[in-house]
Amino acid sequence: MGTFFAEVQLASSARPDRRETVKLLVDSGSMYTWVSATVLRDLGVRPTERRRIVTIEGRTTERAAAEILITLEGRALHTLCLFGEPGDLEVLGAYTLEGFGLAIDP
């Protein structure tokens, strides 16, 4: 299976009129959607919690998280998003894919 990207629109749940279009790597191996903290903060998204995660390298770490509004192919939903740090990939994760009723077809 190859890698592919999805173009999505992101917005703060509090400011849905202010949107940013980004391309995210579709990664069903990642539980959560990850987006650059800079992009999220520019949209007015503020962290509401911290999530403990295990990286692909097997390290346990924490990232800030918040609910965002995400639009994919004309459909919108609220989903949990992690604040990516420098070096983190921006990905569309399994939790969000399942929210849209989507899965990767190998």
Where do the language-model regions lie?
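Pepsin/retropepsin-fold aspartyl endopeptidases
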Residues: M1-P106
